[in-house]
Amino acid sequence: MFLGTYAPKLDEKGRIILPAKFREELASGLVLTRGQEHCVYVFSQREFQSLHEKIRQAPVTSKQARDYLRVFLSGASAEVPDKQNRVTVPPALRSYAGLDRDLVVIGAGSRAEIWDAEAWETYLAKQEAAFANTEEEVIPGLF
């Protein structure tokens, strides 16, 4: 499970050093893809395989499902960390998420997310008030 918030830097070659707490789960490989709210999702190979099995069940007759799958999967990139635990974020994903040198990597349970640091701060500031006022209906049975 991915938890926490980290602040790595993107190097000049577009690489990021994985947070130490994420390395074991991602050591054998990972998949980077477009995330919602213009971040980059990071899935372990195992989690992405599970997700892909669910995605395959989406009806081909649904235009909304086809559109989502095209955007989500066309941006996917399988990567393996190097010996220094660095992963290259492909240029298209860096551009999509507006990634600059300063990043924030957050744990989001089944995945990690890579955000431009400024974009994350803006997003978090907007969401904190809503978080404090979240009703049980958003995630029934949570509290």
Swiss-Prot record:
<dbReference type="GO" id="GO:2000143">
    <property type="term" value="P:negative regulation of DNA-templated transcription initiation"/>
</dbReference>
<dbReference type="GO" id="GO:0005737">
    <property type="term" value="C:cytoplasm"/>
</dbReference>
<keyword id="KW-0963">Cytoplasm</keyword>
<dbReference type="InterPro" id="IPR038619">
    <property type="entry name" value="MraZ_sf"/>
</dbReference>
<dbReference type="InterPro" id="IPR035642">
    <property type="entry name" value="MraZ_N"/>
</dbReference>
<comment type="subunit">
    <text>Forms oligomers.</text>
</comment>
<protein>
    <recommendedName>
        <fullName>Transcriptional regulator MraZ</fullName>
    </recommendedName>
</protein>
<keyword id="KW-0238">DNA-binding</keyword>
<dbReference type="InterPro" id="IPR003444">
    <property type="entry name" value="MraZ"/>
</dbReference>
<keyword id="KW-0677">Repeat</keyword>
<dbReference type="GO" id="GO:0003700">
    <property type="term" value="F:DNA-binding transcription factor activity"/>
</dbReference>
<dbReference type="GO" id="GO:0000976">
    <property type="term" value="F:transcription cis-regulatory region binding"/>
</dbReference>
<feature type="domain" description="SpoVT-AbrB 2">
    <location>
        <begin position="76"/>
        <end position="119"/>
    </location>
</feature>
<dbReference type="InterPro" id="IPR035644">
    <property type="entry name" value="MraZ_C"/>
</dbReference>
<dbReference type="InterPro" id="IPR020603">
    <property type="entry name" value="MraZ_dom"/>
</dbReference>
<dbReference type="Pfam" id="PF02381">
    <property type="entry name" value="MraZ"/>
</dbReference>
<feature type="domain" description="SpoVT-AbrB 1">
    <location>
        <begin position="5"/>
        <end position="47"/>
    </location>
</feature>
<keyword id="KW-0804">Transcription</keyword>
<dbReference type="GO" id="GO:0009295">
    <property type="term" value="C:nucleoid"/>
</dbReference>
<keyword id="KW-0805">Transcription regulation</keyword>
<dbReference type="InterPro" id="IPR007159">
    <property type="entry name" value="SpoVT-AbrB_dom"/>
</dbReference>
<comment type="similarity">
    <text>Belongs to the MraZ family.</text>
</comment>
<dbReference type="InterPro" id="IPR037914">
    <property type="entry name" value="SpoVT-AbrB_sf"/>
</dbReference>
